[in-house]
């Protein structure tokens, strides 16, 4: 991950900062809401893991409340319609997969892609966050690694039967991540978050997850290439 110095020149009360923050804050709130709903739906597909998935969902709901408090602390109203549109692609793909009972695709979208995206965003945000948001985000990111681990472990245990669907789901959903990164880069930069750092941190987390599941380095490079044209 590119080394980031803590920057102190931010005026967290400026209109420029608060305008960008209204969208970034909304994105993280909506991301946690998506995660909450997704884990509850996955509990329907994996009744044997219902207790664990419900626990993960409750954690995501707590995260959402924490990020709502971050917005309140800066007196910013999150632009939730913007955030809902931001997640529309992944949301639609998850709901389609859920309706067809495709648990592998659901796990890839939520437990790998969305979690790795969140980890990247939070890691890059922490050094440049205001003091209140930094404390909240540091606590959240620790939880997200455990959520990523849940998806890894389930998919690793079922790798032989899940591999083909994982490759197809990656092909369909990874390009959406690059579209999302491109869409958010202007606002992220105002907050001190560089797109290149977000991309690198995401690929580290996502690539490590794919490796832990059972994909070879060559396979991971091929799977990662589906998004490179959009970076």
Swiss-Prot record:
Tell me if Lyase is a UniProt keyword of this record.
yes
Substrates-to-products reaction catalysed: a long-chain fatty aldehyde + 2 NADPH + O2 + H(+) = a long-chain alkane + formate + 2 NADP(+) + H2O
Classification via CDD domains: Ferritin_like
Q: Which GO terms describe its molecular function?
A: aldehyde oxygenase (deformylating) activity; transition metal ion binding
Swiss-Prot/TrEMBL keywords = Iron, Lyase, Metal-binding, NADP
Q: What happens when the gene is disrupted?
A: Abolishes the presence of alkanes.
InterPro entries per the UniProt record, alphabetical: Ald_deCOase, Ferritin-like, Ferritin-like_SF
Q: Which top EC class is named for this enzyme in its record?
A: lyase
Which superkingdom, per the lineage? Bacteria
Q: What is its EC number?
A: 4.1.99.5
Binding site residues for Fe cation 1: 32, 60, 63
Which residues are recorded as binding Fe cation 2?
A: 60, 115, 147
What does the Swiss-Prot or TrEMBL cofactor note state?
Binds 2 metal cations per subunit. The catalytic dinuclear metal-binding site could be either a di-iron or a manganese-iron cofactor.
Which purpose does this protein serve, as stated in its record?
A: Catalyzes the decarbonylation of fatty aldehydes to alkanes. Requires the presence of ferredoxin, ferredoxin reductase and NADPH for in vitro decarbonylase activity. Involved in the biosynthesis of alkanes, mainly heptadecane and pentadecane.
Q: Which family does it belong to?
A: Belongs to the aldehyde decarbonylase family.
What's this protein's name?
A: Aldehyde decarbonylase
Q: Which organism is it from?
A: Synechocystis sp. (strain ATCC 27184 / PCC 6803 / Kazusa)
Q: What is the lineage of its organism?
A: Bacteria, Bacillati, Cyanobacteriota, Cyanophyceae, Synechococcales
